């Protein structure tokens, strides 16, 4: 990782990766005209912060000393601890529930991404390490409640979506089937294990969860049943909050890919083989296979993960690649096995743009590079440009809006330092 890319990951993804090597001359963006004393903290009072980590506070102080741009330093100071300050509910033992921002529910995807930047500091702070282990254990528990659900309540209090026409339970906040909901917990657990060496998280709860992941993925390959066991309908004015065909969605041909009824934006898929999420499933299954083999000594279950990953990867190469008249070979966003394709990208991760960030493809993969050119151009119907910046949005927020997440992914999927600087400047100027 080059220094400017590490800087970008620090500021944009709240990660502070490899920042120890940075000096003030490594990354310079022109100062704005705001006086330093106008930048005041937006953090809660110390007594009202939900979780405090000395390792995180030390990292904030360290990074601020390295930054020459006052506004970026101010943004980092407010953004990096925000998850700990406002969303983490740790019981002090082995359970952590993470609110997704202002919604008092825990998304498997969001929680896995929210605490990700703190894993690198876990070995410096025992309480932080315990809190992170608690997130992972809670995620496994959630999967075992219902592997088809995307968001969970802290207890069994029910919620606003209990009337959805699907198999709702009081523990669920929402039950939208999204492949990535089962991938993010594996990714987080693997990263935690590799960073800390702590394998205690891979208990019987984990073994039950990964068995359910495999079962769910295979069900949604639709080989045995063209519909599968999952259906979803909602009474709503938003077309993308419900599914066609009485809740089953548009048909797919069973070719080895996995159906994702909803996107990571929580919007319904058009063609149900969502390509970025299938790539994410491949990388996650291989991580799970390594854990099962090295930690649990479950060689048969490990092989099952490897075999499924290989099957999905083979199907992606055959059905997800399209020879575009302008950009050459590219990855489609969605396919259905009948050789129909959707060409676009959405800001939410996993996305086509974010594939290298998630470790799904190499950043220099020629098909990815062609795809990247397409999704960062007007050939992507959800790529927008304005006076303040440019980037990818999505139907969840509508026309003319870009999500900072897409700018973040853009600067983490390039070797070009000038492109990285451009992205960081946009993030700074549009906060």
Residue ranges and their predicted role:
Residues 8-15:
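Bacterial N-terminal signal peptides
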Residues 387-431:
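C-terminal hydrophobic structural anchor segments
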Residues 75, 126-142, 199-218, 288, ...:
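Extended, well-ordered alpha-helical scaffold segments
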Residues 108, 144-148, 152-155, 167-170, ...:
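Extended ligand-binding clefts on enzyme/binding-domain cores
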Residues 1-8:
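Bacterial N-terminal signal peptides that target proteins for export
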Residues 104-132, 136-240:
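Aromatic-rich carbohydrate-recognition surfaces in CAZymes
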Residues 54-68, 113-126, 184-199, 279-298, ...:
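Well-ordered alpha-helical scaffold segments within catalytic/enzyme domains
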Residues 22-109:
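Low-complexity, Ser/Thr/Pro/Gly-enriched N-terminal "stalk/linker" regions
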């Amino acid at each position: 990782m080059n220094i400017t890319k590490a800087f970008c990951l620090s500021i944009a993804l709240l990660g502070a990766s490899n920042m120890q090597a940075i000096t003030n001359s490594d990354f310079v963006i022109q100062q704005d005209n705001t006086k330093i004393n106008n930048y005041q903290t937006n953090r809660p009072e110390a007594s009202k912060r939900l979780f405090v980590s000395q390792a995180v506070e030390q990292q904030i102080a360290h990074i601020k000393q390295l930054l020459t741009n006052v506004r970026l330093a101010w943004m980092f100071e407010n953004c990096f601890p925000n998850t700990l300050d406002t969303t983490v509910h740790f019981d002090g033992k082995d359970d952590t529930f993470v609110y997704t921002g202002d919604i008092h529910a825990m998304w498997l995807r969001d929680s896995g991404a929210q605490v990700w930047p703190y894993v690198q500091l876990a070995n410096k702070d025992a309480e932080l390490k315990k809190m992170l282990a608690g997130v992972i254990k809670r995620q496994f528990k959630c999967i075992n409640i219902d592997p088809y659900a995307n968001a969970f309540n802290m207890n069994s209090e029910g919620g606003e979506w209990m009337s959805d026409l699907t198999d709702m339970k009081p523990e669920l906040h929402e039950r939208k089937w999204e492949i990535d909901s089962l991938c993010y917990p594996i990714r987080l657990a693997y990263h935690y294990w590799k960073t800390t060496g702590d394998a205690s998280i891979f208990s019987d709860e984990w073994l039950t969860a990964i068995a359910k992941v495999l079962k769910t993925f295979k069900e949604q390959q639709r080989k045995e049943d063209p519909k599968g066991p999952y259906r979803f309908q909602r009474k709503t004015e938003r077309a993308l909050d419900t599914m066609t065909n009485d809740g089953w969605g548009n048909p797919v041909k069973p070719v080895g890919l996995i159906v994702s009824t909803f996107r990571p934006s929580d919007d319904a898929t058009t063609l149900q083989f969502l390509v970025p999420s299938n790539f994410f499933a491949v990388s996650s299954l291989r991580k799970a296979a390594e854990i099962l083999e090295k930690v649990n000594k479950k060689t048969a279950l490990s092989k099952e993960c490897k075999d499924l990953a290989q099957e999905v990867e083979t199907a992606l190469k055959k059905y997800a690649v399209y020879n575009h008249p302008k950009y050459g070979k590219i990855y489609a966003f969605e396919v259905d096995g009948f050789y129909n394709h959707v060409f676009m990208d959405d800001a939410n991760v996993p996305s086509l743009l974010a594939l290298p960030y998630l470790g799904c493809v190499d950043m220099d993969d020629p098909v990815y590079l062609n795809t990247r050119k397409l999704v960062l151009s007007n050939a992507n119907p959800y790529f927008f440009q304005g006076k303040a910046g440019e980037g990818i949005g999505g139907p969840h927020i509508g026309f003319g809006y870009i999500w900072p997440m897409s700018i973040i992914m853009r600067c983490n999927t390039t070797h070009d330092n000038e492109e990285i600087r451009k992205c960081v400047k946009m993030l700074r100027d549009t906060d």
